[in-house]
Amino acid sequence: MSRSEKLTGEHLAPEPAEMARLVAGTHHNPHGILGAHEYDDHTVIRAFRPHAVEVVALVGKDRFSLQHLDSGLFAVALPFVDLIDYRLQVTYEGCEPHTVADAYRFLPTLGEVDLHLFAEGRHERLWEVLGAHPRSFTTADGVVSGVSFAVWAPNAKGVSLIGEFNGWNGHEAPMRVLGPSGVWELFWPDFPCDGLYKFRVHGADGVVTDRADAFAFGTEVPQQTASRVTSSDYTWGDDDWMAGRALRNPVNEAMSTYEVHLGSWRPGLSYRQLARELTDYIVDQGFTHVELLPVAEHPFAGSWGYQVTSYYAPTSRFGTPDDFRALVDALHQAGIGVIVDWVPAHFPKDAWALGRFDGTPLYEHSDPKRGEQLDWGTYVFDFGRPEVRNFLVANALYWLQEFHIDGLRVDAVASMLYLDYSRPEGGWTPNVHGGRENLEAVQFLQEMNATAHKVAPGIVTIAEESTPWSGVTRPTNIGGLGFSMKWNMGWMHDTLDYVSRDPVYRSYHHHEMTFSMLYAFSENYVLPLSHDEVVHGKGTLWGRMPGNNHVKAAGLRSLLAYQWAHPGKQLLFMGQEFGQRAEWSEQRGLDWFQLDENGFSNGIQRLVRDINDIYRCHPALWSLDTTPEGYSWIDANDSANNVLSFMRYGSDGSVLACVFNFAGAEHRDYRLGLPRAGRWREVLNTDATIYHGSGIGNLGGVDATDDPWHGRPASAVLVLPPTSALWLTPA
């Protein structure tokens, strides 16, 4: 039976005030007006479809035409109650009729428990309830598939869903707020599985903005800014890696990390191409881990990823989230751990992103003296707000769980810890005790670290922290921040200052190479020669070395051997493993051509490959990195000869003697104290001809005799090549 006659009812039109809010986009509960509503003896169906020329309700085999009341609101009164199911057939000018389930007849997709946990800041899988999620519901007329959307905007006057599906029209899909939670929600049937969308937010300040989804899993390729509905059907192949990860403690294991900016390692490669080429290269070079500069979506490529706008979306520049999963999977199957840089300290002010999201300071602190980072022109998160803290903690867990990431290197921790960080006098507000410590940030970092290690055992968290803050790597249960490791910025600065000097003057600065051992075991350290040291006019590691090309190459080889021998884990930025001569720029690729044009670059690359192989095979270089038992000086005081020497010890009883000649001339007949007599094998000589060195050395080893020296029971006489490193082990 077909019915198209107009039916009327006393409840056909909503109250004028409600209608006005609906049209203005500021109604907090459009579901209370739209959809099907039962009265005493009839049911009213209302649909808000501006620009539609006809709307028909399909109830079984019956058709009921909705009357256009005003401003795009259509309604019809059905002469019965207990309506089980219906569809809407909507026709626009010049278009064929389109039949769809009514979005305003579905219950909320978030439960009370989810909202309660979020309000308390304790929802550990928050990304599963906020954002965009494809869903299906079984109704009397069949299965209805679509996408549920949920966004936190507690001070907004109204929120609407806009996208390709409705021509970016801000009227057709108003969302409802779920009680006092501040979460706005809507399920939209038949939403495209990879459709673009945003939220049109009527801010508390009267400004209407179109916002990207803070929890979006996918985005448009920058400079476009819309969010994209994204789901995963990826099948992982790294079960063995993940099972082993849960049993490991990275602090006591080998860890040499290759730091990579994906866009400029070899420009033009996708995630899946990188899964082959980058993985093969890292395996060939022998690194145990790769650290990726931020992969979360960021609009400005020149920020290198450190100004994030979509914290839950891998950048779409190189492919889809599943493509990124394939990259991580390939690295894991090759035995390579994956660390990503994570940026919870601050976020950019783009008007379509997180800043003043609902017309008020929401994600950022409301006090400008705490809520803005002046140096970078960015906002600072309000770490004391439970929902914001939950957003960030859940984000850390998201990368660890959804993408199998093995570690987070937390950027700019010092800026989080201190309220007066890079602020002028009078430009900051003290904490409740009158101090400069950001107590809320401390609590956030402790919560993040404790939760991450609980949820994903075996992962590593690393702090980029350059101040004397005590206990960065101390467990949270004894008052520490709970990081696994922190960057040793002091070691980096002192070492680079020293090796940059002409050898003639190094003896006057010998303390720069010994000072780090006064605090080497106060924290668990990473020794970083990172991207920060090859930008902004600093040149490159190669460029810092004094002398001609032969001397520069020798200097860089000895520096790298010193880094690998010093207590702490290693991190080296891409390009430095072959001595790139040009300063790095994200706008172009590495100078791979150097490997075809000169032997020095090939020699440095070969050295890095070999020291990684030696490093992994010698627990003395890593198993006791964080305790004094893993290290002792042989001679820290030979400044006259620019020589340093020390022993490394492994938890398995192994030993390694390391000698560094930072003078520009060789030293013959150099006596070195050793712990035992007998044959000592030269496992590394950075001056070997295979590294394009001069070939000066000890013919593969030396014989130690029972002649005490340097306070040790035995000694050997060595030849120390100029600007070189020697590593020796008992034969």
Swiss-Prot record:
<feature type="disulfide bond">
    <location>
        <begin position="193"/>
        <end position="617"/>
    </location>
</feature>
<keyword id="KW-0320">Glycogen biosynthesis</keyword>
<dbReference type="InterPro" id="IPR006048">
    <property type="entry name" value="A-amylase/branching_C"/>
</dbReference>
<keyword id="KW-1015">Disulfide bond</keyword>
<comment type="function">
    <text>Essential enzyme that catalyzes the formation of the alpha-1,6-glucosidic linkages in glucan chains by scission of a 1,4-alpha-linked oligosaccharide from growing alpha-1,4-glucan chains and the subsequent attachment of the oligosaccharide to the alpha-1,6 position. Is involved in the biosynthesis of both glycogen and capsular alpha-D-glucan.</text>
</comment>
<keyword id="KW-0972">Capsule biogenesis/degradation</keyword>
<dbReference type="GO" id="GO:0003844">
    <property type="term" value="F:1,4-alpha-glucan branching enzyme activity"/>
</dbReference>
<feature type="active site" description="Proton donor">
    <location>
        <position position="464"/>
    </location>
</feature>
<comment type="pathway">
    <text>Capsule biogenesis; capsule polysaccharide biosynthesis.</text>
</comment>
<dbReference type="GO" id="GO:0005978">
    <property type="term" value="P:glycogen biosynthetic process"/>
</dbReference>
<dbReference type="GO" id="GO:0045227">
    <property type="term" value="P:capsule polysaccharide biosynthetic process"/>
</dbReference>
<comment type="similarity">
    <text>Belongs to the glycosyl hydrolase 13 family. GlgB subfamily.</text>
</comment>
<comment type="subunit">
    <text>Monomer.</text>
</comment>
<comment type="pathway">
    <text>Glycan biosynthesis; glycogen biosynthesis.</text>
</comment>
<protein>
    <recommendedName>
        <fullName>1,4-alpha-glucan branching enzyme GlgB</fullName>
        <ecNumber>2.4.1.18</ecNumber>
    </recommendedName>
</protein>
<dbReference type="Pfam" id="PF02922">
    <property type="entry name" value="CBM_48"/>
</dbReference>
<dbReference type="InterPro" id="IPR044143">
    <property type="entry name" value="GlgB_N_E_set_prok"/>
</dbReference>
<dbReference type="InterPro" id="IPR037439">
    <property type="entry name" value="Branching_enzy"/>
</dbReference>
<dbReference type="InterPro" id="IPR006047">
    <property type="entry name" value="Glyco_hydro_13_cat_dom"/>
</dbReference>
<dbReference type="InterPro" id="IPR004193">
    <property type="entry name" value="Glyco_hydro_13_N"/>
</dbReference>
<dbReference type="InterPro" id="IPR013783">
    <property type="entry name" value="Ig-like_fold"/>
</dbReference>
<dbReference type="Pfam" id="PF00128">
    <property type="entry name" value="Alpha-amylase"/>
</dbReference>
<dbReference type="GO" id="GO:0043169">
    <property type="term" value="F:cation binding"/>
</dbReference>
<keyword id="KW-0328">Glycosyltransferase</keyword>
<dbReference type="GO" id="GO:0005829">
    <property type="term" value="C:cytosol"/>
</dbReference>
<dbReference type="Pfam" id="PF22019">
    <property type="entry name" value="GlgB_N"/>
</dbReference>
<dbReference type="InterPro" id="IPR017853">
    <property type="entry name" value="Glycoside_hydrolase_SF"/>
</dbReference>
<dbReference type="InterPro" id="IPR054169">
    <property type="entry name" value="GlgB_N"/>
</dbReference>
<keyword id="KW-0321">Glycogen metabolism</keyword>
<dbReference type="Pfam" id="PF02806">
    <property type="entry name" value="Alpha-amylase_C"/>
</dbReference>
<dbReference type="GO" id="GO:0004553">
    <property type="term" value="F:hydrolase activity, hydrolyzing O-glycosyl compounds"/>
</dbReference>
<dbReference type="InterPro" id="IPR006407">
    <property type="entry name" value="GlgB"/>
</dbReference>
<feature type="active site" description="Nucleophile">
    <location>
        <position position="411"/>
    </location>
</feature>
<dbReference type="InterPro" id="IPR013780">
    <property type="entry name" value="Glyco_hydro_b"/>
</dbReference>
<dbReference type="InterPro" id="IPR014756">
    <property type="entry name" value="Ig_E-set"/>
</dbReference>
<keyword id="KW-0808">Transferase</keyword>
<keyword id="KW-0119">Carbohydrate metabolism</keyword>
